[in-house]
Amino acid sequence: MHSEAFDLKALIRPVVDFPKPGVIFRDITPLFQSPRGLRYVADQFIERYVEAEFSHIGAMDARGFLIGSIIAHQLNKPLILFRKQGKLPADVLSEGYQTEYGEAFLEVHADSLCEGDSVLIFDDLIATGGTLLAAANLVRRTGAQVFEAAAIIDLPELDGSRRLQAAGVPTFCLTEFSLSEY
């Protein structure tokens, strides 16, 4: 698989002052409305991970589900859902974390992973790294290990990728935006 050059940033809409004043939200819905754009993103991740040694894909609630499920299907890997608090029906492990908007909790089914598993964790965007750090902690609490954290977008000025790397979690993103970039 080889993907031609593509202007991914053109399919990521900046929404000013959402969800609160001073924030530029990176809306990926135009990307999902573009079959060519979505195929490009999927192909980039598949090319990177097709021969990688990991056992599971973990996807973050909710936009991480969109790309994580495609990659899990294409790579024939089990998909583990990391959900916002109160959304999973069985026994869960829970981890609190800070987001750029406040405090939140992430949960995963307690029986989703076990010792020896290796998980590629996906989200749409890395900002402060809080969600993916919480997921990494949950993975480690099951006895599994984190293979890498991947996202479509990185906001490097918010230090999320650096925080993940400092916690022993390698990161990979397809593109990045500065906080003031439109």
Swiss-Prot record:
Cytoplasm among keywords: yes
Pathways per UniProt: Purine metabolism; AMP biosynthesis via salvage pathway; AMP from adenine: step 1/1
Compartment list: Cytoplasm
Pfam families: Pribosyltran
Similarity comment text for this entry: Belongs to the purine/pyrimidine phosphoribosyltransferase family.
HAMAP family recorded: Aden_phosphoribosyltr
Name the record gives this protein: Adenine phosphoribosyltransferase
Native source organism of the sequence: Pseudomonas putida (strain W619)
GN (gene name): apt
